[in-house]
A protein has these predicted regions:
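Ampiphathic alpha-helical segments that act as solvent-exposed interaction surfaces
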Residues: 1-2, 85-109, 196-225
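Short Lys/Arg-enriched alpha/beta "domain-start" segment
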Residues: 2-59, 92, 99-154
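Amphipathic, interaction-prone secondary-structure segments
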Residues: 45-75, 157-182
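Intrinsically disordered, low-complexity regulatory segments enriched in Ser/Thr/Pro
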Residues: 68-94, 181-206
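Short, well-ordered helical secondary-structure segments
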Residues: 83, 87, 123, 127-129, ...
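Conserved binding-pocket/active-site segment within a compact domain
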Residues: 138-201
Length: 225
């Protein structure tokens, strides 16, 4: 299962140097092609999306992503969020398509795992700590209760873990739990992220890392507003 940056590595190995924007565009193009060549009814059913067929013969996929209804027009592959005129970030388009392309539709296991327990998670962990955990600590370490308010914008709900914790359904089959422990004179604030073990059947570890980073930044933005 290719992640957001994997395509660039393949191109560089072939002697083609890509800019970050090139990398994302290649990944986006490949993900679009894969979805168009798939059984759309099956992909929609497994991912928890809705496939609508228009009178014109064109189709529309609707998928919940971070508490928003996102739409994909087929076969043009135009993507956007319902009720918003803002251009969807390319990283969001890629994550949505990767989820649609790879979700196996398994029921949640109820077994929580840490980032390090994901395939190759130990290798990605330094980036995860820098881009997800540290921003959460900086934004909410002194006031963990604010995390609960920030998460409401993303459809999050409070859970009884740590000093404050929230579970956010990034996608229909992808709950992510963010946990904070408040610091004191002896200990620094800490943060952790837990996933249902079935996340490996929906997204690559690289995609999970990017997804967590973006959720953390959205909540941090709320805290700074």
């Amino acid at each position: 299962m290719a992640g957001l940056h994997s395509v660039a590595g393949e191109k560089i190995n072939r002697g083609l140097l890509l800019t970050p924007q090139d990398n994302y565009q290649v990944a986006l193009d490949l993900a679009c092609e894969q979805l168009l060549n798939s059984d759309l009814s099956e992909r929609s059913a497994k991912s928890g999306a809705v496939l609508e067929k228009k009178e014109s013969g064109k189709e529309l996929i609707k998928i919940t992503f971070l508490n928003q209804i996102c739409e994909i027009k087929l076969p043009s592959m135009e993507m956007g969020c319902a009720g918003s005129e803002e251009e969807m970030p390319v990283w969001a388009k890629i994550l949505i398509l990767h989820y649609l392309n790879h979700s196996q539709g398994l029921p949640l296991s109820g077994k929580w795992i840490t980032f390090r327990q994901l395939p190759g998670g130990s290798g990605y962990y330094p980036a995860h700590a820098k881009r997800t955990l540290n921003p959460l600590i900086n934004a909410f370490g002194s006031n963990p209760e604010f995390l609960i308010e920030a998460a409401k914008l993303l459809g999050g709900r409070a859970v009884l873990l740590g000093d404050a914790a929230v579970t956010i359904f990034a996608f229909p089959h992808v709950p992510i739990t963010f946990i904070l422990w408040k610091g004191d004179e002896e200990f620094s604030p800490e943060a952790n992220v837990l996933f249902d073990s079935t996340i490996t059947e929906n997204l690559s570890t690289e995609d999970v890392e990017v997804l967590c980073q973006m959720v953390a930044l959205k909540m941090k933005k709320w805290a700074m507003s």
